[in-house]
Amino acid sequence: MKRRVIKMATRASDMHLLNVPLSQPHFFDPHSAWLRHGPFGMWLVHALRPRRIVELGTHYGFSYFCFCQAVAAGDLATECFAVDTWQGDEHAGFYGEEIYHRVMAHNQQYVRFSRLLRKTFTEALDDIEDSSVDLLHVDGRHFYHDVKADFENWIPKLSPRSVVLFHDTEVREHGFGVWQYWAELAAIRPSLNFPYQHGLGMLFWGKEIAEGLAPLARTLTDTERLNWPVEYFALAGESYVRDATQRGVIKRLELAEATIEERKAETVLVQQKLQEARRRPLKQLKRKLVFNMLRAAAKASPPLPSRTAERFRRSAAKRDPMRDDLQTLSGQGFMTYEAVVRGWGKQRQALAGRLSELVRRLQNGPLISVVVPVYNPDPALLVEMIESVRAQSYANWELCLADDCSTDPEVGRVLRNYAAQDPRVRVVFREANGHMSQASNSAIEIARGAYIALLDHDDLLDPDALVLVVQVIDAHPDAKIIYTDEDKIVEGGTRCDAHFKPDWNRDLLYGINYISHLGVFDAALVREVGAFREGFEGAQDYDMLLRCIERVQDRQIHHIAKVLYSWRATPGSAAASNRAKPYANEAGRRALEEHLARTTGKSIPVVLGPIPFSYRALWPMEGTPLVSIIIPTRDHLNVLRATVESILGRTMYGNFELIVVDNGSVEADTLEWFGQIEGSDRRVRVLRDARPFNYSALNNAAVAQSRGEIVALVNDDVEVIAPDWLSEMVALAQRPGVGCVGAKLYYPDGRIQHAGVVIGLGGVAGHGHLLYPGEHAGYFCRLKLRQNYSAVTAACLVIKREIFDAVGGLNESELTVAFSDIDLCLKVRAAGYNNVWTPWAELYHHESASRGHEDTPEKRARFRREVDYMKRRWKTHDFADPAYNPNLALERNDFVLSSPRWCISTKLT
């Protein structure tokens, strides 16, 4: 009973006694032994207002990021330093690079004042001035002599007002000696020990007591109140852990429910396919019979009247077996890849004459050197690969194979036999095994072609792969890099998992090597960059590609939207064994980091991404520019208040103004709240604009009255999820060549609302991946990676003000409500900028919660006018969106296959 009274007294007197409000950490690490100390750590920073914080031993970073969050929230002029080797020790355990990369990624939002010193504690002494550290946290090795040496080495760095924290003051097993050394220090200086969660000792080392810590210091000499701070912060820690755990449980439940719904949908789809498979033979037979009858009728003798014969011909064409059941499948909402491949085969048969003409026209085109490193493939698969090259419709090629000391004698026999029978097959036998890079370079050394095509020793080329590559070269003589779509081939020869890629997409490439196969490079360019480098095995293609793009212009990179390469995906294949090696992931990360250093002149950290062989560049911010967040609204206070409070309370980036544009609110509680919020937070302004609703005009007028270098257009029905959302978007918007930056938006139930806009989807523009489960990786992991899109939604859009002004802002005459953000993005793109979508700026979006839907005749008429404008201005109905692929359907949002359209392109990218 007495303990309960103490808790109540603490709650009632905390502001009087401790003088500083509490906050909860945003960063949650279930591994941390510091969890319950998080609120105290943040309180300490607010109370002490240190000039410099140093943490010795950071590991996962929970305690350190508590300090950083408090610095950012309080807008303090504090420098923070985390010192760690990030290799581990006997007590923390030893670990790999993944923890350091994770810490680097989270630190990105604090780079303005936070530095990670990857050094020993002794080495880091040279980085810190004497008498400059106000807060030191000692959490390194825990043996008595180690903690004693760590602290005493750093005493010269401590300021006259310094406070020192020691973790694990209550642990007495495993040889820990912090408790023993803590007892010695506590006997000579004022101190407070928090005995829960391994123990945290707070030592007033400096003779001066900071003003914010004075109330706490006074309790140390007051026996009546001595336990109050411990009780107070213990309760705060328990509350934080409980809340954070509850949020985690809820998120896992939502994910589980979404997964169940996804499985249900998959089950329905399988059932539909089974039913269709049962009906298909009868439907095909019926189609063929009707087709033959109609075709015969059209050719009847004596001839039918021309109009009647034409009607029969059209009816027959609709039932042509060449079309098979493809349109039916597509109309039912799905398209199997097997059906698409069948359709391509039939369509190519129909185009045989045109293909032959193309081959004849290009027969004097450039020599293509197909480069293949060889090491112990299955001899049968090696033969298949060679035959796929020899079967090319384009004849001006050579096959350059470098055997990397294969131990299977059958491999050598196969290579020698082919070299003897076909002079275009050239083989070099290496004297020592040098792995993929050296073997590829040996093949390149004997290559004589103007272009080099890269092929693995067990993969397959489409028979028309090279002629279609040469068609691009013929249309674009300055082409330097050409890539195609690809699929996989499994045991038994089944083709699957087709990857229909976007056109050149720099930001996607910085996240993953989406270009992959088939890659064709200008031979002089390959030699200029030094071909493949040793030390990047497993990511050697990615490394060379990155070095090549440094020397070419974007317009010299071309994409053929056809599957011309089949990647062998069987156990033991070159691709499978290569990607199974863990060092390949790290090699790719290093390749990108070096590329960014060469191209920017800066050290830009790169961390491993959320999926294997993916990466995230931690783009730095250039200072902390003022961001003007523009939010138009009208009444619906419950929605607006949630938006504003989430931005003010959860956003790590501190230098922003929030401009609420009131478009004629009349509700009393809304008007009252406007006055309250303006008076309580200096960052908030309310602009009155009572004109008839015109989304574009409201935003344009607010931007004109804003002060920020960066503009953020935000709807009044969003809620912040990721505290670093604005830091991420600002850092991207500051990059040279970047225009609009879009966020990852979720519906309240966790499904995807926005992950980039595809032009042409649904006729004008639509959201790709709409309604996907929130944790889904998306089409070839595109929900997890930054990438360029033609457009992003202005429900949360960040752009430099100078770019916004240069393109004329939003179109307030033709696009008053719908599509004005799409139009803005397309104008920005036409001005030469890339628009970027990022998955690391996450918010909820209730979508039209305050404005409503197009549910009146007037609104529907206005919407039709805006659709017509977009079709006239941007030809959205015929827009080949470079972020999409013509093999994917425009009728749906989920990147499903379209009906097969295998044609010989006249419009080449």
UniProtKB/Swiss-Prot annotation:
Alphabetical list of InterPro entries matching this protein: Glyco_trans_2-like, Glycosyltransf_2, Nucleotide-diphossugar_trans, SAM-dependent_MTases_sf
SUPFAM superfamilies named among the record's database cross-references: Nucleotide-diphospho-sugar transferases, S-adenosyl-L-methionine-dependent methyltransferases
One Gene Ontology biological process: single-species biofilm formation
Keywords: Plasmid
PANTHER family the record matches: GLYCOSYLTRANSFERASE, GLYCOSYLTRANSFERASE 2-LIKE DOMAIN-CONTAINING PROTEIN
Descriptive protein name: Uncharacterized protein y4gI
Organism of provenance: Sinorhizobium fredii (strain NBRC 101917 / NGR234)
